[in-house]
Amino acid sequence: MTHDNKLQVEAIKRGTVIDHIPAQIGFKLLSLFKLTETDQRITIGLNLPSGEMGRKDLIKIENTFLSEEQVDQLALYAPQATVNRIDNYEVVGKSRPSLPERIDNVLVCPNSNCISHAEPVSSSFAVRKRANDIALKCKYCEKEFSHNVVLAN
């Protein structure tokens, strides 16, 4: 194996690989989706070279598989991501996120007057695709925000 073909992040026997994450987004995904709340080994590659993207992030989680809902929620942050299911070091399934109708329990409403900040309720946003943007509407205050505003919160 030549130096150019060497794996930059160790292979896993069984679990999930989230590939083609835009550079600088990997840590945000780990935090928002609470992917670190496990006792399983997690391998993170940051700013890895990518032919398509220039640079990319990569997350590997052993013995853990994402639900279809979790995969789709990645669409806001990494619409071009590929989620691979690994078994016995082989890719046994591949999926790409598609924009869900709702995103629950992940984001925080940017409206400081929203009841979701004062009450013990789970966040919930309706997702709408616009011409050049994605709009998120809070279930509680019913205010609509550009997804960039909510993601920066």
From Swiss-Prot:
Gene3D superfamilies attached to this UniProt entry: Aspartate carbamoyltransferase regulatory subunit, C-terminal domain, Aspartate carbamoyltransferase regulatory subunit, N-terminal domain
* One Pfam family linked to the record: PyrI_C
Q: Which InterPro entries match?
A: Asp_carbamoyltransf_reg_N, Asp_carbamoylTrfase_reg, Asp_carbamoyltrfase_reg_C, Asp_carbatrfase_reg_C_sf, Asp_carbatrfase_reg_N_sf
The cofactors it requires, by name, are: Zn(2+)
The residues the record assigns to binding Zn(2+) are: C109, C114, C138, C141
One Gene Ontology cellular component term attached to this UniProt record is: aspartate carbamoyltransferase complex
Query: In Gene Ontology terms, what is a biological process of this protein?
Result: pyrimidine nucleotide biosynthetic process
- GO molecular-function annotation terms? metal ion binding
Cofactor binding notes: Binds 1 zinc ion per subunit.
Q: Which UniProt keywords apply?
A: Metal-binding, Pyrimidine biosynthesis, Zinc
**What family is reported?**
Belongs to the PyrI family.
Instruction: Kindly give the PANTHER family that the UniProt entry links to this protein.
Output: ASPARTATE CARBAMOYLTRANSFERASE REGULATORY CHAIN
Summary of subunit composition and partner proteins: Heterododecamer (2C3:3R2) of six catalytic PyrB chains organized as two trimers (C3), and six regulatory PyrI chains organized as three dimers (R2).
Instruction: Tell me, in a sentence or two, what this protein's role is.
Output: Involved in allosteric regulation of aspartate carbamoyltransferase.
The protein here is known as Aspartate carbamoyltransferase regulatory chain
- What species was this sequence derived from? Shigella flexneri
